[in-house]
UniProtKB/Swiss-Prot annotation:
Annotated metabolic or biological route of this protein: Protein modification; protein glycosylation
UniProt-recorded Gene Ontology molecular function terms: acetylglucosaminyltransferase activity; protein O-acetylglucosaminyltransferase activity
Family: Belongs to the glycosyltransferase 61 family.
Segments on the Lumenal face: 26-590
Catalytic activity: 3-O-(alpha-D-mannosyl)-L-threonyl-[protein] + UDP-N-acetyl-alpha-D-glucosamine = 3-O-(N-acetyl-beta-D-glucosaminyl-(1->4)-alpha-D-mannosyl)-L-threonyl-[protein] + UDP + H(+)
Full protein name: Protein O-linked-mannose beta-1,4-N-acetylglucosaminyltransferase 2
Membrane topology recorded in Swiss-Prot or TrEMBL: Single-pass type II membrane protein
TM spans (from-to): 5-25
Localization (cell): Endoplasmic reticulum membrane
Main location: endoplasmic reticulum
Organism: Takifugu rubripes (Japanese pufferfish)
UniProt cross-references to SUPFAM superfamilies, sorted A to Z: Fibronectin type III
Keyword Zinc-finger recorded: no
UniProt gene name: pomgnt2
Positions on the Cytoplasmic side per record topology: 1-4
Amino acid sequence: MSVGTLLNGLLVSIVAALLWKYSKLSEHAALLEEELHMTRQSQELSQAHIDYHVALQALQEHGTRMVCTGKMHTDRICRFDYLCYCSEAEEFVFFHSNSSVMLPNLGSRRFQPALLDLSSVEDHNTQYFNFLELPAATLRFMPKPVFVPDVTLILNRFNPDNLMHVFHDDLLPAFYTMKQFLDSDEDARLVFMEGWEEGPHFELYRLLSNKQPLLKEQLRNFGKLMCFTKSYIGLSKMTTWYQYGFVQPQGPKANILVSGNEIRHFAKVLMEKMNITRAAGGEKDQGNAEDEKPKDEYIVVFSRSTTRLILNEAELIMALAQEFQMRVVTVSLEEQSFPSIVQVISGASMLVSMHGAQLITSLFLPPGAVVVELYPFAVNPDQYTPYRTLASLPGMDLHYIPWRNTEEENTVTHPDRPWEQGGIAHLEKEEQEQIMASKDVPRHLCCRNPEWLFRIYQDTLVDIPSFLEVLQEGVKAKPLLKKSKLSSTLHPGRVRDPQCQTSVQTSNEAKLTVSWQIPWNLKYLKVREVKYEVWIQEQGENTYMPYILPQQNYTFSDNIKPFTTYLVWVRCIFNKNLLGPFADVLMCRT
């Protein structure tokens, strides 16, 4: 082999090596450039810094991780690390690696019917959440992910066009879910996955966080694959008090877990975020007398401009002013900003409104205020009670009065409107006549009952004498609002040091003495009435004997037998109905 050939071969090898190295450097540079681009995209979403390479490595090596609370899909909320969303498929993706965690690991039960509810409306088949599964290795064949470094709460808004649904289904549940699960709730980002546009009340959702909420449609703008570094999915249902009639006719929930205290705390926070201070006279400390009026008591009337009108609104306003000798103010969702309406309502003594979503603003009323709800002809106030239920929650301290139009000649119907506004022209003539002749809408399921829609969208000429009569009777029945003491709602702790002593008197007589010390927290409370409940059960029997006692010891002799073992439980009761827990059971042998 000649020297020239050898040098040529060597030169080719060197050039090939250089080209290979250059291609690798170019590939690495392209990768770095892509990572930089993806980092920029991630940072477009958030001010939080993210190390893209570290985040990508974590996803590839550890995959997605999930830990949930709750036993059923209806009460489950899940925390995810590195859950991803593919905007192309419109699906969430769980990437599996050897380090992935999935608790609960339900297998196919995850589809019976879903992992969880995305909204606070229980078990609604349009609100189910689930995800697809892929091995983490498939990330190599997918578009580079954009990472969302914020802690996110992912949910569905149920009906963002309706103010009642906005508060009851979305804002309250999201507010307390964030309190429960998120470390810094004001810095969390809300992600709405139901697919709706912003809607008329989007500013209210913005109040929950310092960060702009994201809509489902916006996610595709940030890339084909988005990965949430830390997210919570689902909403707590503990703050909801009403069910809308999907399974049974609408009404209060069977097991209400929220009180007025939580509602009022939420309202206070929202007012602060809207820069609203409660109007003068709003917090009325009435003490034991109601005749001493604050400087500026006034009544608020909600005015509607399109449907469900009060046809003689001006006459109604004059009658209220004369009857109660108060100023009457009108507010309108169509004409005023929401904060300005809340400012007015927060100081009102009475809120008067036709049935409708605007009555959810009653949660901003001061304690002691009156809520007056008007119902159109043939609509039974006892069957549609979201605002009555709200007003009656313990701690809301609102007095609720319903009025119903009972005169058919005082109603104006709209049979030719679209069906969703109560029109019935699309129905068979026989069904139209049946609806027109009906005097009372029968109980029904949600959501398209034509008779209900026909009647609820009527306009009403309010019969002033009957309206004032109902109001007078209702106001008479209004309880005095006393300044509530926190101690009046607190429960006793367990009685301390319970003991029993026994003695046998004769072959068929015995005595059982039970004693105990007061609950530890009682020494710090001023309680009007303290009593104790004692249960005595003969061992082996199913029944027990209950006793209510004012003192801390008592000797029982009736029905106490010698040489018998008795089980004894003791608990404290404040003010007749605030029950404490039972102390550990005593086993007492005579």
